[in-house]
């Protein structure tokens, strides 16, 4: 319980009293402890930056499998642009300062470069049998098929409730925890507004090669939008 510092400190010291040879060993102990406390036999970790350390992770954890979810860069851009709104759409625990930071830090060029970099890293593991790349759009359109494939990859049984997902976490809509569904309306939300033509142009221009490699069709521009110069 990280909210209780004394309790958390005591548990940490007890765990770390074991022989620790590397930061990855600490991470392994952390995963084992959290999984045990929650009665789980499988640890599931979703830190995006882990993508940049896949080689080390796969080497240190021989039984680990990785699912890399890829989404249209323009929808990612729209999400990042509106990320600051999460505090007002159901995530009330997000501090106001964090909402302000998200608003100030947004920039289409930076977001596009991060997306492009992550997809470049992803492409290196396309032939790795322990890494499965899933397009977000495919998951929403063919939910049952895609979830079955994911279960097969993970060697776990498919369960019907895997298709019942609370509609939360959006940066453009209010949370709806009572609505349990894989929401296909999330596909190509950027086409419904929210991004300027300049943002779309920059996004596509900076991510062109990776968009082509992962099958994302680009919007055509005869000339660059005039407002591009402001970015």
Residue ranges of predicted features:
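Soluble or luminal CAZymes and related metallo-dependent hydrolases
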Residues: 19-26, 46-49, 107-118, 142, ...
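Conserved phosphate-donor/acceptor-positioning beta-strand/loop module used by diverse small-molecule
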Residues: 46-49, 56-82
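Membrane-proximal basic amphipathic "stem/tether" segments
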Residues: 217-231
């Amino acid at each position: 319980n990280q909210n209780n510092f004394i309790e958390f400190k005591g548990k940490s010291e007890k765990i770390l009293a074991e022989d620790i040879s590397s930061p990855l060993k600490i991470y392994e102990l952390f995963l084992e402890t959290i999984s045990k406390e929650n009665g789980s036999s499988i640890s599931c970790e979703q830190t995006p930056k882990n993508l940049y350390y896949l080689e080390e992770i796969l080497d240190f954890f021989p039984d680990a499998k990785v699912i890399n979810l890829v989404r249209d860069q323009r929808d990612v851009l729209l999400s990042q642009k509106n990320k600051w709104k999460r505090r007002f759409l159901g995530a009330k625990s997000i501090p106001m300062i964090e909402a302000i930071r998200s608003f100030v830090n947004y920039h289409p060029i930076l977001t596009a470069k991060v997306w492009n970099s992550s997809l470049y890293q992803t492409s290196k593991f396309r032939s790795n049998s322990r890494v499965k790349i899933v397009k977000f759009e495919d998951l929403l359109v063919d939910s049952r098929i895609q979830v079955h494939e994911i279960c097969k990859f993970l060697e776990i049984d498919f369960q019907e409730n895997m298709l019942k997902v609370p509609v939360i976490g959006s940066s453009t809509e209010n949370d709806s925890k009572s609505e349990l569904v894989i929401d296909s309306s999330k596909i190509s939300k950027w086409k419904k507004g929210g991004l300027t033509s300049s943002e779309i142009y920059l996004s596509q221009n900076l991510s062109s090669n990776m968009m082509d490699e992962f099958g994302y069709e680009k919007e055509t521009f005869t000339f660059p939008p005039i407002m591009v110069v402001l970015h």
